[in-house]
Structure formats: C-alpha cells, structure tokens
C-alpha cells in the first residue's frame, strides 16, 4: 500500500505540471501566496485599525 501510495503521489506530483496545469498553478499559488498573505494581512488590519 505504501509503495502504491508513493507511486501515485510521484505520478500526480510530476504529471500535474503537464497534464493538469491548473493543479500546478494552484499548488504554486497556495505556497507563494500563503507566506506573503500572512504578513500582508497583519499590517493591513493594524493600519486600518
């Protein structure tokens, strides 16, 4: 089961780039937007307050 799961993960992680462009963009957006969103949201409400 573990082996099958790793294979599926690798296949889905590598294929999404060419097969599912939206999947790769979503993953990149979440990772690239998560860190900048946290610090950006803090100063936003602080300054508006």
Curated annotation (Swiss-Prot):
Q: What else is known?
A: Encoded in the Qin prophage region. It is missing about 390 N-terminal residues compared to orthologs.
- Deleted gene: phenotype: Loss of H(2) production on minimal glucose, complex glucose and complex formate medium. Alters production of organic acids when grown on minimal glucose medium. This phenotype was not complemented by reintroduction of the ydfW gene.
Official protein name in the record: Protein YdfW
Primary role: May be involved in H(2) production during fermentative growth.
Q: Where is this region: Disordered?
A: 16-49
Q: Which organism is it from?
A: Escherichia coli (strain K12)
